[in-house]
Amino acid sequence: MAVEAHHLNPLFSSNREMIHPVEASGVVYNTQMRYGTVPTFNPTVECQTSLFNPIYNISPVDRLVHQSMKPTIQSVDSSLTFNSDNNVDFLRPVSSRKRSREESVVLNPSAYMQIQKNPTDPLMFLGQDLSSNVQQHHFDIDRLISNHVERMRMEIEEKRKTQGRRIVEAVEQGLMKTLRAKDDEINHIGKLNLFLEEKVKSLCVENQIWRDVAQSNEATVNALRSNLQQVLAAVERNRWEEPPTVADDAQSCCGSNDEGDSEEERWKLAGEAQDTKKMCRVGMSMCRSCGKGEASVLLLPCRHMCLCSVCGSSLNTCPICKSPKTASLHVNLSS
């Protein structure tokens, strides 16, 4: 809030000493003199001061000198007197040449400034007391200064609060960014963990499936091995049992012609039967596809051993039962 101060002429404040009234005293300074007033003649004071005062008011230094000398003059005793028409004044010369303590006030700047700062006389100008106006002017200036100081203090406090809020907001924004980044990283790691857990579960299931397949294949291999051993044992057994059967057949065949066949014919028939058996055995051991290679491939699941190694890798069906081939085993019959 702005306050208007009463503006005075700078002459009033700069020439304050000029407009002080003359103090009332018994000497020449006691005259109620104003600007350019001639003092009354007093023979008692004539020996101490000049006849006339300056055209303006008494200077502060002269007034201080008068105030300092006044008690000194009154305190000195003397027997000399001077008679005038109306009164008798005692002339009391200074008994001591030492400077009194009061006189040192004039030469002490600090005391002079203290007196100037604390004037007790009213401020007069053209017969009007301006002390209240000057005091009001000083109060207005002090109020303006205090208002300005308070406003500056409030502005500084507001700026400090604003700066503090900005700093707090900047720190909060940085922390929020860091927290968001950490949250995103945590979410990403959580998703990755879920994916890895699902992957581990699927791998465990797949491992169990392959384990079951391996166990089933192992059981199939064991069954095929046992079947193959049985087939090989049967073939080996048939190989050792075939010649007596052929001899018996030849003997029975020869025994049916006892009347007109000779011994030579019996042996001839036995040889032909043997050749026929050999041809049948050779036909059974040859490849049913090409007819050239030896049958050494066992087809599954029909279990027919009717293909050679070359045809077994190229054909997908059994030439005997025409069933599709799912697997094949190579059998080594060499002894």
Swiss-Prot record:
Region WRD domain: start-end pairs: 196-232
Zinc finger (RING-type): 287-322
Cysteines joined through disulfide linkages: none
Stored InterPro entries: Znf_RING, Znf_RING/FYVE/PHD
EC number: 2.3.2.27
GO molecular function, one term: transferase activity
Disruption outcome: No visible phenotype. Decreased resistance to B.cinerea and increased cell death upon pathogen infection. Boi, brg1, brg2 and brg3 quadruple mutant shows a higher GA signaling resulting in a higher seed germination in the presence of paclobutrazol, precocious juvenile-to-adult phase transition and early flowering.
Pathway linked to the protein: Protein degradation; proteasomal ubiquitin-dependent pathway
GO BP, sorted A to Z: defense response; proteasome-mediated ubiquitin-dependent protein catabolic process; regulation of programmed cell death
PROSITE patterns linked: ZF_RING_2
Coiled-coil portions: none
Catalytic reaction equation(s): S-ubiquitinyl-[E2 ubiquitin-conjugating enzyme]-L-cysteine + [acceptor protein]-L-lysine = [E2 ubiquitin-conjugating enzyme]-L-cysteine + N(6)-ubiquitinyl-[acceptor protein]-L-lysine
Enzyme class: transferase
Keywords recorded for this protein, A-Z: Metal-binding, Plant defense, Transferase, Ubl conjugation pathway, Zinc, Zinc-finger
Induction: Down-regulated by pathogen, salicylic acid and 1-aminocyclopropane-1-carboxylic acid (ACC). Up-regulated by salt, gibberellic acid and methyl jasmonate.
GO CC entries: nucleus
Recorded domain comment: The RING-type zinc finger domain mediates binding to an E2 ubiquitin-conjugating enzyme.
Summary of subunit composition and partner proteins: Interacts with the DELLA proteins GAI, RGA, RGL1, RGL2 and RGL3.
Protein function: Probable E3 ubiquitin-protein ligase. Has no effect on the stability of the DELLA proteins.
Protein name, UniProt field: Probable BOI-related E3 ubiquitin-protein ligase 3
